[in-house]
Amino acid sequence: FSFFTFMGYALIILYGIALLLIFAYSVLQLSLAINYRKTKKERDTRKRPDFNWDDLPVVTVQLPVYNELYVVERLIETVSQFEYPRDKFEIQVLDDSTDETVEVIAKKVEEVKARGIDIVHIHRTNRKGYKAGALEEAQAVAKGEFIGIFDADFLPNPNFLLETIPYFDSDDIGVVQTRWSHINKKFSLLTELQAFGLNAHFSIEQGGRNAA
């Protein structure tokens, strides 16, 4: 029983294990695809729940950022354009930056605040807990009954809150996550492949899990 014989058996066993894992993953993906297909028509015709628009809840939007010099102004401006009652809308810019992003945010926040929007710049220097820590600390002083979170590269539509908040009228709903789109999908073959993978994840995988 030589060393090479042992290695041969070991490789066969590892190959068999890899095949089993691939098979199990394929079965899981197939089941998600079947669930997605079964409920596709229902999702396509689903309407936004009825909601009492005179009794909208207060919403706080949190924007956690770290050294996002080139995109942070775009993010703040996009969120400031949300279609929502100004007296029920708060923006928290959670800034853990260590570069000139801090000054860029401060200037943009003052500009947005001058338009009558409730926005606050929370800058930390200790970075305790990193992103999760920033969100937790800010939540303690948030005014909103509901929290929306957007990363620095997000560009949510102006009607985002009006389209999502009504779902919370159901006691069965605790979290709402929406599907992403891609502003640079056609930039290169790599970005097209990345967009394809993310689209499959949100539509088939998440849709299938939700239907299960």
What do the PLM-derived regions correspond to, one by one?
Residues 1-55, 206:
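N-terminal membrane-anchoring/stem segments of glycan-assembly enzymes
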Residues 31-88:
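N-terminal signal-anchor transmembrane helix
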Residues 61-63, 91-93, 175:
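Structural beta-sheet core signal
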Residues 63-65, 95, 150:
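Short beta-strand/turn micro-motifs composed of small residues
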Residues 71-78, 104, 134-137:
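Well-ordered alpha-helical segments embedded in enzymatic catalytic cores
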Residues 77-122, 127:
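Acidic donor-binding segment of Leloir-type glycosyltransferases
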Residues 97, 135, 151-155:
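The conserved acidic donor/metal-binding loop of glycosyltransferases
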Residues 109-145, 158-212:
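Long helical/loop segments within the catalytic core of UDP-sugar-dependent glycosyltransferases
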